[in-house]
């Protein structure tokens, strides 16, 4: 038995990939074991914007959810990532064809830094929807000022420091991600933008 109030399990990749199938089956069984009201499925999808035709496409999300449902999992919340704001009529379409309440179709428009994501999720009421699902009453208003401060430092600080990383895989963007993040955190703590 675990003493945690929440356990977050992320399964990356694309729904239906052979590598992730055992994990998808494990969370399906886990949900059955603990009871549906004690497990929440959040599905993150890309809602592409096509510049040539100036339109947002919901079909990839619909197909992704269809594939997930074929594996026995109905998402409770769908987070729709897009480079543009998703109009309400498109969100309603996703809600209808994916069988998810419209208030649980959450958009997240691409941000300049990952540290803006909590602010974006709060703006879309993701935190409220999660608490509501588990029937937890929020006792206080969320204080996003620390996230706003971090975002401001990253995006607007004039002072910067240049650091070179020497390594075999420096051309791969995520090869030294943990080192990159550690240096970014050090920069935030010292009001500096870190240029790698």
Language model: regions and residue ranges:
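N-terminal beta1-alpha1 cap of cysteine-dependent amidohydrolase-like domains
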Residues: 1-5, 11-196
């Amino acid at each position: 038995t675990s003493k945690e109030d929440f356990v977050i399990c992320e399964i990356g990749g694309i729904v239906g990939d052979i590598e992730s199938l055992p994990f998808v089956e494990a969370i399906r069984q886990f949900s059955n074991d603990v009871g549906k009201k004690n497990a929440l499925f959040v599905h993150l999808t890309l809602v592409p914007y096509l510049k040539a035709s100036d339109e947002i496409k919901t079909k990839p999300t619909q197909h992704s959810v269809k594939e997930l449902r074929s594996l026995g999992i109905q998402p409770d919340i769908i987070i729709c990532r897009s480079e543009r704001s998703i109009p309400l009529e498109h969100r309603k379409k996703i809600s209808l064809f994916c069988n998810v309440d419209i208030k649980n179709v959450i958009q997240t428009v691409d941000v300049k830094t990952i540290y803006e994501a909590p602010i974006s999720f709060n703006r879309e009421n993701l935190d409220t929807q999660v608490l509501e699902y588990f029937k937890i009453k929020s006792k206080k208003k969320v204080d996003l000022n620390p996230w706003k401060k971090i975002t401001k430092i990253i995006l607007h600080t004039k002072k910067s420091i240049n650091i070179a990383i020497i390594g075999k895989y420096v051309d791969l963007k995520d090869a030294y991600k943990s080192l990159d993040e550690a240096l970014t955190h050090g920069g935030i703590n010292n009001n500096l933008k870190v240029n790698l």
